[in-house]
Amino acid sequence: MNNDTPIVPKKFLTVFILLASCFALWGLLNNMTDNLVPAFQRIFTMDQSKAGLVQVAFYGAYAVLAIFAAVLAEEFSYRKGVLIGLAIYIIGALLYIPACIAQSFDIYFIAIFIVAGGCSLLETTCNPYVLSIGDESTSVRRLNFAQMFNPVGSLMGIVLAQQLILSHLNPATADERALMDEATRQGIIHGELFWVCAPYVGLCAIAALIWICFFVKREGERDVTRSAFSRVVVALLFSIVPLTVLYFIFPEMNKVHWVLCGVLGPVAYVALMKDYREMLLILARTPRYWMGVIAQFFYVGVQIAAWTWLNVYCQKELGVTPADGAIYYMIGLVLFLVCRWTATFLMKYFNPALMMAVFSVGAICCCAGVMYLPSDVLFTVEIGDHTLPFAANILCLVAMSGFMSLMFPTIYGIALGGLDPKALKLGASGLIMAILGGAIITPWMADIIGNASSSWCCLVPGFLNTWDPDLKLTQTSLRASFIVPAICFAVVLVYALAFSKRKQ
């Protein structure tokens, strides 16, 4: 590896900055959307399963539209793919306005799906776009560098959600709201939905500015032919028609199954088109690629699952409030950001795959610490008005975020490294479809947490088996559930070791 090769050549610096802003944009949106689940539960007085449709819409859009995004980039260009992704992002965010006026969760569901669809197009095109603007020997470092802006956006998303959405929720419970007169209740709901809507509409201005910058940054692209346009339209129909039909014909269908069935549409398109079928065969014959898709599926799943249950774990083990638990999550995100910056620098001197193997071992050790180390308080930290206790197991839980930091972009870069250029864009879509792991791994972990008699619970000493009526879980099952992240990190470790001796 030539250490003197620039990560980003000067001629691509402007494009790289615009792409990095897109990374921050979808990171911001991801973490704002996570907070819509508790918000909608309170506003619409719905149960957790229906509020959880927010996540189904979000990850479903990623899985279903990733192949369409690849076709878009293949037939048009990366730049046009980014432009269309940003446009869809803006349209979805603007739909929050009629959703707020109509006070309709169904319109919000559609808006979230469209916004996430825009993010899916952005991720599918921006990641390989970053890989392509420079020397291949620095591609993994360049992608890690761009991905550093993603957790910056994530932190901003958490702050915006806390300050603009959650802080404006009325504290009245569902029972208290039921006793209110209609005018009072509608006034409260209208005010709450206004603050749900406001930050998303504000993001439209930022997305529009980025869109304008990309629009004026032309780079001698080919003209779009009628044939290419037709192929893109057909790919879009294959992506959305099966999903729409399933949604209206089988409204009671398990939403995870709904998404999995919806993915069959775009997959069928790829199988039916001869040139895309050839690309698919290239990908199937490239172990570093399809193994990378599997590793990415488990990595995204473990990231979302671990962060989903971090707050609950802190509440149970330390007796802290949900607000304090959110601070532990923010500390983990800051560590995630710092470690990603550090790892990107170290990749100048060390093999990225070998570094990922070391980080995977560290993450597995953290899982063991979360499962077995005591929760006796070692020290406390004052953050504003909050006093946060830290125990050995909590330190491991927070440190896990640091070890996760380099995995997504490194898996992505290794999987696409050296891939036949003809299959690169379709290959990128497979790695984005792997984000569906977030909708599969998280429920798996939840099943263990909610089942005190699960066979997994035998992994944790029985003396920790205490029932918490408020959180509706046992300490044993909560600790035992972290065997799932350990398994996921083990998959990433196997992938890293398989390619650690090959030239990156």
Where are these regions (language model features)?
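Intracellular juxtamembrane helix-capping segments at the cytosolic ends
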Residues: L121-D135, S405-D420, S429
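Central cavity-lining transmembrane alpha-helices of secondary-active solute carriers
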Residues: L53-A73, M330-A343
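Extracytoplasmic
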Residues: T14-M46, L122, C126-N127, A306-C314
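Conserved MFS/SLC helix-loop-helix module at the cytosolic interface between two early adjacent transmembrane helices
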Residues: V64-D106
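A late C-terminal transmembrane helix in Major Facilitator Superfamily
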Residues: S154, L416-C458
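C-terminal ends and interior cores of transmembrane alpha-helices
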Residues: A87-A102, G362-H386
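Extracytoplasmic gate region of multi-pass secondary transporters
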Residues: T33-V37, I158, Q162-L166, S239-G262, ...
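Cytosolic juxtamembrane N-terminal segment immediately preceding the first transmembrane helix
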Residues: M1-W26, R42, Y276, L280-L281
